[in-house]
Regions:
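Post-cleavage N-terminal segment of exported redox proteins
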Residues: 1-53, 59, 112, 130, ...
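Short glycine/threonine-rich turn/loop motifs
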Residues: 28-130, 193-318, 323-326, 333-336, ...
Length: 374
């Protein structure tokens, strides 16, 4: 049986993007700068060249890169909202179409090994080009069309020359610049970092410390890992925690339709079928690997700055951290036979749950938001 047409299209544009950035390593002016002293709580990281970051930042905020000039990267990854979109469960794409997935934060994305929640991109360079070509996101017909548009804009000539010593754009340069800007979005040095790695005893209050103890006691650190000298709060693996099965069950009955930011209405599934709206399940990692074991499995997100990056889960189905804690405490979705065995009911009273939420709040970096405009 052939994959659905939409899945075949997604695989095709992902492959095209990957081909365009092949061979970036060691590409002269694309090379990154020196290794920086790591931010407290994070591993070492090569610092991108400043001119490359500046060009990437300009591209990131530029709506002219979309097919109809209405969308930019920053419209789904809003700096003042933790580089996600707090008002939307899932992103809104070209012509107002509601996408399947919540926009993940870009904070500390330099340390993410496999990009997108299904892990379909191995590098930031490969990831950066995909939204430009996705038919429901920025909807450009080809990278050539994007490059021609950039070359027609006089305000790009100086930034391009500063980054690459030439005034014209290339596919590799476009990918490298966007990736460089994303690599610059580092946010660590949280209260937890100061307490755990910096040994500042008073950096956390007693409730936050109790929340951390519960976090360890109940095995949350198995997936949201803490290493000896740093903590990415992810195992970079893919798990089915039951969320998609729960969402699918709700989809059989009704759908929340976005009317405006923060305003939704519930519409019966039968009514949507009448007007031809496509019914789209999300199979997660399976859409990349086609392995049955990967159905409804999604990449473990980092918990850094999680208090800033709601709504939560790959589909934005939980609006608060308290709701997320309640979901885990209840054992996820027990009716899903493929749910990860590590998801089980937890004995947590109201004070325990509040302490866990307080601990998660202690993971917020003081530099988690950056200026909105280039």
């Amino acid at each position: 049986m052939k994959p659905p047409r939409r899945l075949r299209s997604a695989v095709a544009f992902a492959a095209a993007a990957a081909c365009c950035i092949a061979g970036l390593a060691g590409a002269g002016p694309l090379a990154r700068g020196a290794v920086a002293n790591p931010a407290l709580g994070l591993p070492e990281l090569q610092v991108p060249a400043p001119a490359l970051v500046a060009l990437g930042r300009k591209l990131f905020f530029d709506r002219r890169l979309s097919a109809n000039g209405t969308l930019s990267c920053a419209m789904c990854h809003v700096p003042a909202q933790g580089f996600t979109a707090n008002e939307l469960r899932t992103s809104v794409g070209m012509n107002g179409v509601s996408l399947r997935r919540n926009a993940p934060t870009l904070l500390n994305v330099a340390h993410v090994r496999r990009l997108f929640v299904d892990g379909r991109a191995a590098t930031l360079e490969a990831q950066a080009l995909q939204p430009l070509l996705h038919p429901e996101e920025m909807a450009n017909p080809s990278l050539a069309a994007v490059l021609a548009r950039i070359d027609s804009l006089a305000d790009y000539r100086t930034p391009l020359r500063s980054a690459f010593n030439r005034p014209r754009a290339s596919a590799a340069g476009l990918a490298a610049a966007l990736a460089a800007y994303e690599r610059s979005l580092i946010a660590a040095g949280s209260n937890f970092d100061r307490w755990y790695f910096g040994r500042q005893a008073d950096a956390l209050d007693e409730t936050e410390k109790r929340g951390f103890a519960l976090f360890v006691q109940h095995g949350c650190v198995q997936c949201h890992r803490i290493d000896g000298d740093h903590a990415l709060f992810t195992d970079a693996a893919f798990h089915n925690i039951g969320v998609q099965a729960n969402t699918d069950a709700q989809r059989l009955q009704s759908v929340a339709v976005l009317l405006a930011p923060g305003e939704t209405t519930v519409v019966a599934r039968a009514e949507l079928r009448r007007i031809g709206v496509e019914d789209r399940a999300d199979l997660g990692r399976y859409e990349v690997t086609r392995r049955a074991a990967d159905r409804r499995a999604f990449r473990t997100p980092s918990l850094r700055n999680v208090a800033l990056t709601g709504p939560y889960m790959h589909d934005g189905s939980f609006s608060t951290l308290a709701a997320v804690v309640d979901y885990y405490a209840g054992g996820g979705t027990p009716s899903d036979p493929a749910q990860d065995a590590g998801i089980r009911p937890l004995a947590l009273d109201a004070a325990d749950r509040a302490a866990l939420v307080a601990f998660l709040g202690s993971l917020t970096s003081p530099v988690a938001a950056s200026p909105n405009q280039p």
